[in-house]
Every structure is written in structure tokens, then in C-alpha cells.
Amino acid sequence: IFFWLTFLYFFLRYMIVDKYMPINADGQKTEDGEKKGGLGPLFTIFYFVLIIMSQLFINMKLTQTICGDDVQTSTAMSATIIPNVLILGVVYIMLVLVPGWKAPFSNTFGYFAANLGGIRDVLNTLTNTNFEEKGEGNITLKQNQINIFKSIYKNPSQLINNITPENFHKFLQTMQNIKYFKPSNEHTDKNIKKLYSLVVIKDLVSQFFWYMLAGYLVITTTFDSLINMKCQSSEQRLKELAAKSEVN
């Protein structure tokens, strides 16, 4: 259940919220980004509520099995909420405050997913390849700049791994200022939006793996806690047990 809820959360976040550029190349807020931006926190709150409620339901059933049909509500609640707050909650906060934590998964699994989506081709489509020629529409640069740009064009993986949703606008401005990207037009702007959406995929895949690790730790911690708990029988349950013992 945790896997599918987490997968659905990130899929919907991408499709409805995160794939839209919040700021365009000119530094102006985009219409789509402005409309969808406020939905992100709502998705996150709804996700955490669903995760805790689903785990609580399962854990209450587990206590019922362990304690002979006597549900341990308070024990199940503490064993569910505390690990989620201390583990999954802390991971969420750290990924927001320290985005660099996402790099190990973003630069591996995230890069693989973005590469399947064609991020290298999109980046190369944006690249100005006419550095050495002179004439209308072409760029003349120093030889060392040309060599650097050619190297990046042949193997853009390092450049791709340095792009994040947080620094995308700054990256875009830098590429345009040094003339690495082609001048802005309708076709270029469309590819920039596509590049951003693929960078977001790379980032979300990284977050997904972090959540899965945290979720695994939460579930194992909760399970161990419930397996070793002391059952607290209700007054009604004690009366039933006493009646059975008298009959015997």
C-alpha cells in the first residue's frame, strides 16, 4: 500500500503540478505555474494523511490479531504516528531544506529516467552548434569556448546532473548569456518547457527513492514495536476470559 500510494502521489504531482515551469526565461511567472503552484502543498498534506490512516488501519488489525481480537488503539496510534513523524517527516523536511540530499538518486536513477524521456536530445536541440562559422544567425567565440561547448554537446551528462528545478531559471539565464542556447523563439521555448519537465522527472524519481527508504524504515520499526508490545485487555475482555475459566 505504501508503495502504490507513494507512486500515485509523485505521478499526480508531476502531471498536475510540478511539470509546469513556474518562471519563464524572462523571469516572469508563467500562467500554468501560477495556477498549479498552490496545489503542491495540498497534494503533500493529503498524501501524508492517507499514509498515516492506511498504516493505522493495518496496525490496528495487527494488534487485534496479536491480542486475540482485542484492538490496541492507543498502541497502534503511537506506533504509527511517531515513526512517521520522526522518520518520514524528517526526510521530507531535509529534502526541502537541503536539496543536495537528492543528488545520489537524482544523478543515477533520476538521470536514467530522464534519459529515457530524451533529455539529452532535448538539450542538444536547444544547443547552438554554429560557433565556428561567421554570418547571420551564427555565434563567433574564442577557440577555448568552442572546445568546451563541443565537449558538453558530445557528453552532456555532467551538465544535466547539475540542473535541478530549484536552479533551472538561473541555469537557463546562464546558457543564454554565454550563447550556448539558441536565441529564443516559439520552437526553442517549447523545448525549454520540455527540458524543465524532464529535469522535474529526474528530481521526483530521487524523492521517490528517498520516500521508499524512509517508508521501509517506518514500517519495520512499527512492526517490531507492535510484535513486542504488551496486550492491554479491556474490562469486557477480562470478564469474558474470567467466565471461560470458571466454566472450565
What are these regions (language model features)?
Residues 21, 64, 99, 128, ...:
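Short, flexible coil/linker elements and helix-boundary hinge sites characteristic
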Residues 87-189:
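Charge-rich cytosolic interhelical loops and cytosolic tails of multi-pass membrane proteins
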Residues 1-112, 201-212, 223-240:
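N-terminal first transmembrane alpha-helix
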Residues 9-24, 180-196:
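Membrane-proximal N-terminal segments immediately preceding the first transmembrane helix
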Residues 116, 236-247:
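Juxtamembrane inter-helical linkers in multi-pass membrane proteins
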Residues 29-40, 71-77, 139-161, 176, ...:
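Membrane-interface segments at the starts/ends of alpha-helical transmembrane spans
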